[in-house]
Amino acid sequence: MTTQDFLLEIGCEELPPRRLNQLSQALSQTIKSELEKADLSFENIHRYATPRRLAVLVNNLALQQPQRKIERQGPSVKAAFDKDQTPTLACFGFAQSCGVSTAQLKVKKTKKGEFIYCEIEQPGQNTLDLLPNIIQSALKQLPTPKAMRWGDHKEFFVRPVHWIILMLGKDLVPATLLGKMASCETRGHRFHHPKNILVTKPDDYQKLLLTHGMVIADFEKRREKIRDLIQKAASEKGEAIIDEGLLEEVTGMVEWPVILVGNFKAEFLKLPPEVLITTMKVHQRTFPIKNKNGDLLPYFIIVSNIESKNPKRVIVGNERVINARLADASFFYDNDLRTSLENRLPKLGDVIFQRQLGTLADKARRIEKLAAFIAKQINIDEQLAARAGLLSKCDLVSEMVYEFPTLQGIMGYYYAFHDKEPPLVAEAIKEHYLPRFSGDQLPRNLLSPCVAVADRIDTIIGIIGINKSPTGDKDPFALRRAALGILRILIEKELSLDLFALLNEAKNNYAVELPNVNVVNQSFDFIIERLRAWYLEKEVPASVFMAVLASHPDDPLDFDRRIKAVQHFQTLPEADALAAANKRVSNILKKQAAELKSKTIDHSLFDSDAEHLLADQLKERAELVNNLYKKADYTKALSELASLKEPIDIFFDKVMVMVDDKEKRENRLALLSSLQQLFSQIADISLLS
């Protein structure tokens, strides 16, 4: 099959740097999807992205769709042939429209009866003709929630478009996209090579931009080059602190990276390192440098988009801005230190947490109570937990956090140390925001989780209590993230807490009456649903989750232990047979629920060895399993129960449960009920079948 390379480039004004890589991936994926939908084969796809362009190179794209066999259905057999099986006018007309003789027509049975049909070889369309619509369709699927219009164009895109390349091999694909006629010309660096560059064939695109246009088109290559240049430049002073998010953003801001090293006044090193790093990162997109001990040095790395003839001027400009920013930060910090965290509590009363739920001062007092309640459950100092909870939000009204919101908690940590609060309290103020996102680190000490869980539980109860639960993609109060944070803390830090009791306590701490009377149950269900989603991400089968859920554990850590026990149980050779047997038992007991008046087993009513064997084995295992259950050793408990496979199999082989004799029937049902209870106190194993 004949193939050619295909190139698409969309040249535009500067694209959002934080979303550039995502846009590039999406464009590549949508084009791939549309080509596959059109049945056009290709070898692979390369994507390119710089601040001024999105491009896709498709290698060895087929120049034509393959021939396809299509079936055309005609009239029914009754209409196509008369009583003598002679073709009718309808049959001749259909055959003529298909370009075949009546002898070439076939009969096919359908739900609506027998119909005649013909198979037609449909030639594939030329790729050159298909490409404009394919690209149009791909562009419509791009995630561009803030697309814009420009000039008098009706088209929308992320940024105004200035040029378009559409090439198949050496040929131009004639089309108009996003208001621009396609051409074979790209443009180089905005300052170093603003002139047009003729692309003679798609495969030369990346090389031409590099050698003629001073543009590194490949996003990944550009990012790694920047990383290498930063590390090399920093090595003369120390070691660069490379934030991956900032590196991604800077890669989206430059086409031709040039690395420069600047410095700031050493006197600013007295500021907390997080303040210095945030100032350099947020305001100037620069990378800090540290020494071998991890201490910050008064230097930073600048990633410039131009090879300046006077690099010193670029450095001085950045130094002037950073020194000014750090001078402001130093002023805010010194001002903040004049007021203790405790004395900031009244100011929290001026900040609304949520209109129906009161102020941040109200929330801080609720966290204080709930943190102490949690501390008592896990044998942590209640007074320290209460103190940390009370002060946890005080830094939100400091000048530093007002200027740098991402430093919430961190500044509270430094201010608490300055106020001579206990070190654990200071750490809890900083760590109670952890985890901030999926996969983030957890609080390190055991006091911090008390405040972290209390804060999140209070928010969940309050927001669900005023009937503002998340719906669809909308979660303005980040309740899903809060729920996942609670679960990760309790499970990964191995903290045993009754979630239902905790939610009740949180509800009672609210001074206002929450409109949602079912708030505790709904909050519990909401958190458990996040637990289900979490296990789904970990590829825990839904049947395992449902089996554990059926036993109604209120403690997330206990829930997790049961999950692991059931997963281990599934690896045992007896697992499938026992799951099937439990399902059989469950079905029998559901149908005969009315007859289970007494759950006492009467051995005198047994008339077979199989009944005695199962009853004896149950009694023997029950004591052992119940002791293991009390220790929460569910894995060993289920392993012990696996030994019941043989007596259960013998029982069902030899014994008829639903006999006419009522006493014997009810006694056998009681025996099966005891068997079910022994398993179900850990999980409903029948749901694994």
From Swiss-Prot:
It is found in: Cytoplasm. Its EC number is 6.1.1.14. It comes from the Bacteria. It catalyses: tRNA(Gly) + glycine + ATP = glycyl-tRNA(Gly) + AMP + diphosphate. GO terms for molecular function: arginine-tRNA ligase activity; ATP binding; glycine-tRNA ligase activity. GO terms for cellular component: cytosol. One of its GO terms (biological process) is arginyl-tRNA aminoacylation. The keyword DNA-binding does not apply. The keyword Ligase applies. It is an enzyme of class 6 (ligase). Keywords: Aminoacyl-tRNA synthetase, ATP-binding, Cytoplasm, Ligase, Nucleotide-binding, Protein biosynthesis. Pfam families: DALR_1 (PF05746), tRNA_synt_2f (PF02092). Belongs to the class-II aminoacyl-tRNA synthetase family. Tetramer of two alpha and two beta subunits. This is Glycine--tRNA ligase beta subunit. It comes from Coxiella burnetii (strain RSA 493 / Nine Mile phase I). The gene is glyS.
